[in-house]
Design a protein with these regions (language model features):
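N-terminal type II signal-anchor transmembrane helix
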Residues: 2-32
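Alpha-helical structural elements
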Residues: 17, 22, 161, 166-167, ...
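A structural signal for short, hydrophobic/glycine-enriched beta-strand patches
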Residues: 23-172
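A transmembrane-helix-recognition feature enriched in membrane-embedded lipid enzymes
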Residues: 173-195
Length: 195
């Protein structure tokens, strides 16, 4: 009888582990929302192109009059400036007036991006922002931005890009997606423990 109970417990643990594995991508991307009119579009750093393309699309569709570009994490300030420059040049070539592009050269992580954007929102009188990033980044962003914006009267909406490499229900099939998911779970644990 005891061995049957042990087998049932092990089977239940295996089912739970498989379920967690199967839904890992969905859990990370679930906080993404639907874009709505806002005061600014924030294109987060570490962008391979999808974030800036999504920000441009939102701008062209009239969701906000400003685009804020954030810096590259863990990079020297001159590298951050160069990184911000290529994204700004892309936007200008696509028709965005340079006066509509703002820069955050000081953020070194998602938490900084949220805090620095909130400070800018307060200074400019913004009420809401659209935060653009990749789908598996959404869960951690919800933690960082939710904490920064809590009780401020300001709103943010997380808007996910649509990268070709991402399939939330089959994330393990793409090496890039698998690396992103594993990295995000490590960072998520860090955020939960630290902040």
């Amino acid at each position: 009888m005891k061995s049957v109970r042990t087998l049932l417990v092990l089977a239940l643990i295996a089912i739970m582990a498989l379920t967690a594995f199967w839904h890992a991508g969905r859990y990370l991307s679930a906080p993404a929302g639907i874009a709505q009119p806002a005061d600014c579009i924030v294109a987060l750093g570490r962008d391979s192109g999808d974030r800036i393309v999504t920000a441009l699309d939102l701008y062209r569709r009239g969701y906000a009059p400003w685009i804020l570009l954030t810096g590259v994490e863990d990079s020297p300030s001159d590298t951050r400036r160069a990184y911000l420059t290529w994204r700004a040049e892309y936007l200008v070539k696509a028709g965005v007036p340079s006066a509509a592009i703002l820069y955050d050269e000081h953020s070194t992580n998602s938490r900084d991006e949220a805090r620095n954007t909130l400070a800018r929102a307060n200074a400019r009188g913004w009420k809401s922002v659209l935060v653009v990033s990749d789908p598996p980044h959404m869960r951690r962003l919800a933690l960082a931005w939710g904490k920064a914006f809590a009780g401020t009267g300001k709103n943010y909406v997380l808007v996910a890009t649509a990268p070709a490499w991402w399939q939330e229900r089959a994330w393990w099939r793409s090496e890039q997606a698998a690396q992103f998911v594993l990295t995000e779970y490590v960072k998520l644990c860090y955020y939960l423990a630290r902040y």
